[in-house]
C-alpha cells in the first residue's frame, strides 16, 4: 500500500491563548486533487504554514510520502518534494519568466550559484524552461520583466516556478486571488493541466474554481476540520452552507 503523499496527524498550533489550529488530521493521496476551504480567520494560512515548515506545531505531526517531516525546514521539505505558491506573489520582478524558471531549475539541480553560466549552456535546462513556458502560456512573455506581466500571467508564472522544483505535492494558496474575472479561466486551465502524478491541495475562496477542480474538499472552521467529502457532498452539507457557502451557493 502506498503511503499518502501528505498527511497531518493531530496538528495543533497555539499562539499564546489563541488556538489557531486545533487537532487537524487529514490525508492527501498521491495524485489527488483536493481543496481546502473555510471562512476568513478559519486558520487556513496557519495550517499551510505548518504543512510547509514555516512554523512548527505545538503538538501533532506532518508526514511527506510516509516520512515524518514535522521538524524539518521548509527548504528540506522542498527538496523532498513539497512545494507551494503564495497568496501574494513571491516573484523576481526584474527577471524575465525564462530567467526566473532557469534560476528555479538550477537551484533544484544544485547549481543555483552558477545560474547565469550554467542555464544557457545546458540544453536540458533550456528545454525544460521552454516546456514550462509553453505549458503555462507564457511563451510570448518569455523576455519581458515579470513586473510588466498581466497579473494573471504572474500567477501562472508562480505556479510554473513551483512546478519547476518537480514536486510530488503542490500546495496552491489562492492562485486566483486578485486575478481579473476574464483571466480566471486561464488559471483553471493551468490547474487542469498539472501533471496527474502530482498531488494538489488548493486553498481558494473562488468556489467555482474549487468545485471545478477538486474531487475532494476539506472544510476548516475556527481551526478545526468541520467535514470532508466529494464536492456534491460539501455543497449539500447544511453546516457548510451556514458557515461558508451561503444558502444559494451551488444549488
Identify what each model region corresponds to.
Residues 2-251:
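Glycine-rich phosphate-binding loops of nucleotide-dependent enzymes
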